[in-house]
């Protein structure tokens, strides 16, 4: 049934976001109390977006937060992190993901953090996420940065602590895997678009619960190759899928379905690992001609943002929501 639903979503682009709330009251803990030294400044950026700035480990960091105007603060609200790619920006991520409209429709909050600048002997960038691999020379603690944002969000909003998710493009996808491994107690599920796991994330991964994983990738991606990149410390996509299928005790081999778009000259392969613990799932969507991009229905018959929310919203920290 789940396989048919996702394939229908890809073919028709008509699936709305999921969103059934789970009864997680017994898991809720009181929001943290700010230490006296913590200071955060939030300003109105328009269109229901706030820009919040604070100093983290002696670096000025910021994030953009979108709260739908019609959000019900009396009900527990799911929270989605959307992480930009290497050298990218939070504002650009807002534009190409279009998660705001999905948040309006499905009642969740979206946070778009901004990565810190990075300079090493090999590379230099205006922004990055420290997830190992080619960013291993960084001394930025992005896991703690994200957790600090979570703690602040709990103070300001009625966040459902069992339904905090992460997704990202490229380096943001790598970071989402890194959070699944290193902030597992806070992150219910993740989705990666054109990202993978770095060698460090893969080797040191220590999740605390079965974790739903969605990977969307292009077979022709030259930046994060499907087969991996040893020089830059990138695991192959099959290696990443196999890691999570094994950790979640899924069936060793996936169920595979292929949607052919003959007129457009491409196909989309869908791999679904079944019978995982807590009814979670590990899923790979592989587009035959996609390169390094965030796909949508109009360009590649693949509505990534809709598919991501439909996938993530099925789960909380305890697995599939009843």
Which residues make up each language-model segment?
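Hydrophobic h-region of N-terminal signal peptides that target proteins for export
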Residues: 9-15
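A domain-start/cap signature at the N-terminus of enzymes
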Residues: 15-79, 91, 105, 138, ...
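Serine-hydrolase catalytic machinery in alpha/beta-hydrolase-like enzymes
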Residues: 53-70, 74-165, 174-178, 182, ...
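Post-His helix in hydrolase/transferase enzymes
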Residues: 297-305
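Histidine-bearing beta->alpha loop at or near hydrolase active sites
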Residues: 289-293
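The conserved beta1-alpha1 loop
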Residues: 81-87, 194, 217-218, 288
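Sec-dependent signal peptide recognition
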Residues: 1-9
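The feature captures the conserved acid-bearing segment of alpha/beta-hydrolase catalytic domains
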Residues: 188-268, 272-278
């Amino acid at each position: 049934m789940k396989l048919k639903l996702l394939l229908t979503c890809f073919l028709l682009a008509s699936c709305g976001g999921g969103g059934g709330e789970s009864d997680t009251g017994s898991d809720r803990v009181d929001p943290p109390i700010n230490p006296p030294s913590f200071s955060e400044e939030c300003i109105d950026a328009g269109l229901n977006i706030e820009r919040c700035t604070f100093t983290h480990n002696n670096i000025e960091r910021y994030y953009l937060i979108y709260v739908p105007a019609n959000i019900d603060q009396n009900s527990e609200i799911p929270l989605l992190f959307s992480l930009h790619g290497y050298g990218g920006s939070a504002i650009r991520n807002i534009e190409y993901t279009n998660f705001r409209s999905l948040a309006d429709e499905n009642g969740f909050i979206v946070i778009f953090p901004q990565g810190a600048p990075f300079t090493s002997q090999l590379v230099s960038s205006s922004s990055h996420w420290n997830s190992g691999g080619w960013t291993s020379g960084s001394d930025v603690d992005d896991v703690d940065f994200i957790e600090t944002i979570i703690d602040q969000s709990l103070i300001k909003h009625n966040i459902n602590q069992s339904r905090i998710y992460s997704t990202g493009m490229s380096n943001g996808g790598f970071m989402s895997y890194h959070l699944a491994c290193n902030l597992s107690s806070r992150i219910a599920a993740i989705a990666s678009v054109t990202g993978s796991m770095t060698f460090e994330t893969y080797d040191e991964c220590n999740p605390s619960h079965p974790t739903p994983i969605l990977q969307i990738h292009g077979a022709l991606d030259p930046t994060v190759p499907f087969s991996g990149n040893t020089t830059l410390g990138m695991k192959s996509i099959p290696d990443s899928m196999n890691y999570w299928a094994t950790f979640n005790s899924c069936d060793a081999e996936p169920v595979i379905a292929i949607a052919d778009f003959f007129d457009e000259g491409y196909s989309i392969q869908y791999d679904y690992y079944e019978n995982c613990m807590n009814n979670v799932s590990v899923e790979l969507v592989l587009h035959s001609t996609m390169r390094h991009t965030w796909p949508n229905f109009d360009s590649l018959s693949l509505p990534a943002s809709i598919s991501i929310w439909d996938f993530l919203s099925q789960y909380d920290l305890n697995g599939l929501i009843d």
